[in-house]
Amino acid sequence: MRDYLDEARRYYCNIVGKYGTQVQALLKKAATVEIERICPLHGFVWRRGIGDFLEKYQKWSTYTPEETGVMIAYASVYGNTANAAELLAVRLRERGVKTVMFDVSVTPASEIIAAAFRWSHL
């Protein structure tokens, strides 16, 4: 699953993410049956690691961050905001805080949205 986790997260967060309550209801129903495979309309068919996959859906559907850290998304026309964002990231890292940065002018929005689900602070 590890190889496909980033894409699974990106799909969930961008397509299914706003339906957390409905996903929770479905996960409750799914817990009462034996699942041999998951066949989504888009993406991979899951035959192995189904428990891990369902755990991720549980986490994502309750909007629980996967990691503690800060995601910094910025746009910078003249470079000043990029410099400020980098300075913020450096200061946070000096304090032991994990950080990830995204330049919104070059990073696909779907990746930024997925990261917003993954990290505890924006």
Give the ranges of each region predicted by the language model.
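Metallo-beta-lactamase
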Residues: 1-40, 44-48
